[in-house]
């Protein structure tokens, strides 16, 4: 679930010590942790939380409700009762009333135990989200992929600003249809118009199970981070739940679902929620497109039924930040050109892409290696396409995975390619050190080479092998310079976006320049 962030923060660290940090978290399987969130709370507490959740949804997505509650100073309970919300707003004042917000997360909130209970629940949810990132670990099953993904995570933490903490970097995602029927104005992936879905026929199901089986074989437990949508609407595929169940049977994890059309086929939505109740380990999400849409969803599903569903308010008046990518980017550029204002919060939100790994389009039988980047003219959809393959069989799918891992997931900078710092980094020379500043961090890097390694990289005129020879004067310094390059590479500060073949493309493959 999203977390509030400062739009800009800076911290300085020594590069060497930063690279020596290792994660010490216990690798608790996400399903076990998820079940604990609910099992350690009583049925009555879970019910109360579902109604507080609904109250918070109305506050975020319904300005009339928000106004009515605020104006009913002494008896806001009458307002919530009209909406079927069985919680007294006076019992959760630190969650919503302006003159009580200062008490939140402090001992002074003790008179409102329901407020404390909600915040503890939300902390558990955020902790669960952070655990999801750890479940992409492939240090034992696929070390090269693991090192590449860790490098992308470090780069994203440095480069993406407010988007970075909420990205869990799943290693694989699947598209089960072509395009999308919804056409959200803010779509960060500029989903193309709907052209059809991947039917669950005997032939298709066989290929699907084979592909998922290969992913599970190659990636091990990390395949459990996968999900089955991208620039698509899951509910556009009327057999979507059958694909989900296959995925669960093969990997042991039920993929998470995000939909902007939960009412398009309510029976399908309920089947998906039913699978979640049996096997789910990650919160599903409904994108709410307007207050009218929120009203329809709340009429169709009780608070208890949506306990495991996050409602993301995406209306034009909603507080949810929109990434400056895809359709939202084009809309803002168009209005800016006409000198018209566009009113939606960005909050340093640079992308909605989340996968550092493989994007699989089943209708086209296309396999891409992708990773999040800030939306830009070069990458308008907020993710970089590193490589691409086609496949017709599970064996060809396996070959495509392995060939892209071999080609693109290098352990050190390629010796024959230019070596330079990332485009977004500001380089400053220092005394036996140099500084790299991004939108989010400042790195201080010790540099004792006879000729400054930082300066040579900043020039951008050398390959890695040329730089090592130029910065070194003896065998010992050669090793030291090569080691420093490896550290910088692992930290994600070396530019890897050196291939223009897939740049400037929209979701339908059209070059946008």
UniProtKB/Swiss-Prot annotation:
Amino acid composition bias (Basic and acidic residues), ranges on this chain: 1-16
Region (Disordered): 1-21
Superkingdom: Bacteria
Keywords noted in UniProt: Plasmid
Protein name per Swiss-Prot or TrEMBL: Uncharacterized protein y4wI
Gene source species: Sinorhizobium fredii (strain NBRC 101917 / NGR234)
Organism lineage string: Bacteria, Pseudomonadati, Pseudomonadota, Alphaproteobacteria, Hyphomicrobiales
């Amino acid at each position: 679930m999203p977390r509030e962030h400062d739009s800009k923060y800076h911290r300085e660290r020594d590069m060497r010590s930063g690279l020596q940090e290792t994660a010490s978290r216990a690798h608790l399987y996400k399903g076990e942790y998820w079940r604990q969130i609910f099992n350690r709370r009583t049925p009555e507490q879970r019910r109360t939380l579902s109604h507080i959740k609904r109250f918070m949804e109305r506050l975020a997505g319904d300005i009339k409700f928000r106004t009515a509650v605020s104006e009913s100073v002494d008896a806001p309970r009458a307002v919530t009762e009209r909406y079927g919300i069985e919680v007294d707003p006076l019992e959760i004042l630190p969650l919503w009333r302006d003159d009580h917000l200062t008490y939140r997360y402090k001992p002074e909130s003790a008179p409102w135990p329901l407020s404390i209970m909600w915040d503890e629940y939300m902390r558990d949810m955020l902790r669960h989200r952070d655990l999801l990132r750890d479940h992409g670990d492939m240090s034992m099953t696929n070390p090269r992929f693991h090192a590449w993904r860790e490098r992308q995570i470090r780069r994203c933490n440095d480069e993406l600003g407010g988007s970075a903490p909420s990205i869990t970097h799943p290693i694989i995602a699947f598209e089960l249809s072509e395009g999308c029927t919804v056409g959200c104005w803010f779509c960060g992936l500029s989903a193309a118009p709907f052209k059809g879905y991947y039917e669950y026929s005997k032939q298709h199901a066989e290929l699907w199970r084979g592909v998922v089986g290969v992913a599970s074989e190659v990636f091990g437990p990390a395949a459990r981070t996968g999900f089955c949508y991208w620039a698509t609407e899951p509910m556009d595929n009327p057999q979507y739940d059958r694909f989900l169940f296959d995925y669960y049977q093969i990997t042991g994890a039920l993929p998470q679902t995000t939909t902007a059309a939960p009412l398009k086929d309510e029976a399908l939505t309920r089947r998906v929620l039913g699978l979640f109740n049996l096997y789910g380990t990650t919160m599903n999400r409904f994108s709410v497109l307007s207050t009218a849409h929120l009203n329809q969803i709340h009429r169709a599903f009780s608070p208890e039924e949506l306990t495991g569903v996050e409602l993301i308010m995406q209306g034009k008046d909603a507080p949810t930040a929109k990434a400056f990518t895809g359709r939202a980017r084009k809309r803002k550029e168009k209005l800016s050109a006409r000198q018209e204002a566009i009113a939606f919060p960005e909050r340093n939100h640079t992308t909605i892409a989340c996968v550092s790994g493989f994007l699989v389009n089943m209708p086209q039988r296309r396999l891409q290696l992708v990773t999040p980047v800030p939306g830009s003219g070069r990458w308008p959809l907020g993710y970089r396409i590193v490589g691409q393959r086609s496949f017709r069989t599970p064996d060809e799918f396996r070959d495509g995975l392995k060939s892209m891992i071999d080609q693109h997931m290098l352990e050190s900078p390629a010796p024959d390619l230019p070596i330079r710092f990332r485009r977004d980094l500001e380089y400053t020379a220092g005394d036996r050190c140099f500084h790299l500043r991004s939108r989010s961090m400042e790195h201080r890097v010790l540099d004792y080479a006879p000729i400054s390694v930082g300066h040579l990289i900043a020039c951008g005129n050398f390959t890695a092998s040329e730089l090592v020879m130029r910065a070194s004067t003896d065998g010992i310094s050669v090793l030291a310079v090569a080691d420093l390059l490896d550290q910088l590479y692992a930290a994600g500060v070396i530019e890897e976006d050196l291939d223009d073949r897939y740049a400037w493309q929209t979701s339908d493959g059209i070059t946008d320049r």
